[in-house]
């Protein structure tokens, strides 16, 4: 379908509780409905910029699209304490088939002696399961 900017938005995946849209070649949005302990749900949205390294932002909403505090539902996600001596990106992806989340932290640390010297990039992958209304590290 044509979006408001004149580009094409593609719905790439759709299940009963998950959707993935590509708005441009370099941006996507994932949405997942996650059950709470009562009969309600929260909606998890992950916005990701794909170039040059994927970098994501996660938000939560109630069933009426009112914003909810992210720290309540994903308090242990990595990458929130990014220091000035390292550059990091956090790529978050939701599972279309299960209430799980994959968080990949990519970072490079630069030496202070030479701005052009880069230490070996490090990548860390974390898996989270949705349990009792919050994402919990496996």
Label every PLM stretch briefly:
Residues 69-138:
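Short aromatic loop motif centered on NTY/YTY
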Residues 21, 48-54, 114-119:
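Short consensus segments that form the blades of beta-propeller domains
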Residues 38-73:
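Mid-length scaffold segments of soluble, non-membrane domains
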Residues 21, 31, 43, 67-70, ...:
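Short hydrophobic/aromatic-rich beta-strand segments that constitute the beta-sheet cores
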Residues 15-19, 39-44, 99-102:
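Short, hydrophobic/aromatic-rich segments at coil-to-beta transitions
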Residues 1-34:
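Terminal domain-start segments
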Residues 19-22, 45-50, 103-108:
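Short beta-strand segments that buttress and anchor functional surface loops
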Residues 28-38, 88-97:
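Structural signature of eukaryotic scaffold interfaces centered on beta-propeller domains
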């Amino acid at each position: 379908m044509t979006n408001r900017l004149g580009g094409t938005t593609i719905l790439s995946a759709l299940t009963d509780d998950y959707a993935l849209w590509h708005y441009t070649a370099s941006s996507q949005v994932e949405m997942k409905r996650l059950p709470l302990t009562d009969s309600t749900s929260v909606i998890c949205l992950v916005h990701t910029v794909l170039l040059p390294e994927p970098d994501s932002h996660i938000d939560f909403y109630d069933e009426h699209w009112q914003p909810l505090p992210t720290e309540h539902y994903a308090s242990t996600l990595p990458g929130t304490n990014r220091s000035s001596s390292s550059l990091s990106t956090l790529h978050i992806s939701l599972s279309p088939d299960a209430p799980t989340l994959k968080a990949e932290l990519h970072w490079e640390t630069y030496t202070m002696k030479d701005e052009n010297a880069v230490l070996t990039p490090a990548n860390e992958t974390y898996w989270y399961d949705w349990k009792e209304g919050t994402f919990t590290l496996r």
